[in-house]
A protein has these predicted regions:
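Glycine-rich, proline-tolerant flexible connector loops at the mouths of alpha/beta enzymes
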Residues: 1-17, 70-80
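Alpha/beta catalytic cores of nucleotide-metabolism and tRNA/nucleoside-modifying enzymes
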Residues: 12, 18, 22-25, 29-37, ...
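A short, structure-level motif marking secondary-structure boundaries and short turns
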Residues: 9, 40-42, 72-74, 99-100
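Active-site-proximal loop/turn and secondary-structure-junction residues that shape catalytic pockets
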Residues: 1-3, 42-48, 72-76, 108-110, ...
Length: 270
């Protein structure tokens, strides 16, 4: 995310090895006396010329991280192309002597993907990102696959409408109905991917402004046994590869541990 990396955060941070280590160490120290584990998630690096994951993985472990997750893309790739699972395998091998779990992330859209990633990379587990957008049942499928059990059947359209309503109700309990009605709109598109509901219904759902309106729009589909066509796959924006925005002189000295100017006002990840 440019607004994050241009301040030295997100995928730009591990390039500054000492600064990265200081931050992980501080987080670990802050949790002393608790049972809260500090874990680190990172990308392969800034771009193909600046891979950071092997050094950063080792630094994270030495700084006390309980687990390390690698998304198999560089920041420059955004979500384009395919995740480099071979880099997850490299990190797992690199940290094998530490005993610290290495988790894989990137292009996990179905249960089979998780099983295949673990088989190909030797990673200790997987983290799911975009693949669960509009598909929260994916986690039950992943659990079944990794336990060697039968994969649960995909939900029908009627069942999905009930999940949408429950999601919206929980949002309303947390953020109020007005905010919930706005926030659920983006999720509805993901939930209904591949279902034959028609453009007019989708347009109405994209403008829903209350829970009652949502219930009314979804009611005709409550008993539908339709199944989604081609519902798995990438969700959200994929983008195109692009140059990563960095602070001036960021690449000059990887051992510089100075905190970038205004870094403390941006803490949303990246």
């Amino acid at each position: 995310v440019p607004k994050v990396t241009r301040r030295g955060g997100g995928s730009a941070l591990p390039y500054k090895r000492r600064l990265f280590g200081n931050i992980v160490s501080a987080a670990v120290k802050a949790t002393e006396g608790t049972n809260i584990p500090v874990t680190v998630k990172m990308r392969v690096g800034i771009d193909d010329e600046h891979h950071t994951h092997l050094d950063a993985g080792r630094i994270a472990v030495e700084s006390g991280a309980a687990a390390v997750t690698l998304h198999g893309r560089t920041a420059a790739q955004r979500y384009s192309g395919e995740a480099r699972w071979d880099e997850i395998a490299r990190l797992k091998e690199h940290l094998a002597d530490t005993g610290v779990p290495v988790l894989g992330n990137g292009d996990i859209f179905r249960a089979e993907d998780a099983r295949r990633m673990m088989e190909q990379t030797g990673c200790d587990g997987v983290q799911v990102g975009r693949g669960c957008l509009g598909r929260p049942w994916l986690f039950a499928e992943l659990g079944a696959a990794l336990r060697g059990e039968s994969i649960p059947a995909e939900p029908t359209l009627g069942e999905v409408t009930q999940v949408i309503l429950r999601h919206a109700e929980l949002l309303a309990e947390h953020d109020g109905e007005d905010n919930a009605s706005r926030d659920i709109r983006k999720h509805i598109g993901w939930y209904l991917r591949g279902f034959p509901v028609g453009g007019q219904v989708r347009a109405g759902l994209a403008k829903v402004n209350s829970l009652d309106a949502l219930r009314e729009l979804l009611a005709p589909w409550a008993d539908s046994d339709a199944l989604a066509a081609d519902a798995d796959g990438a969700r959200g924006r994929q983008g195109s590869p692009s140059k990563v925005a960095l602070p001036d002189g960021w690449l000059d000295d990887p051992e510089d541990d100075c905190v970038p100017v205004a870094a403390d006002i941006m803490n949303s990840g990246g």
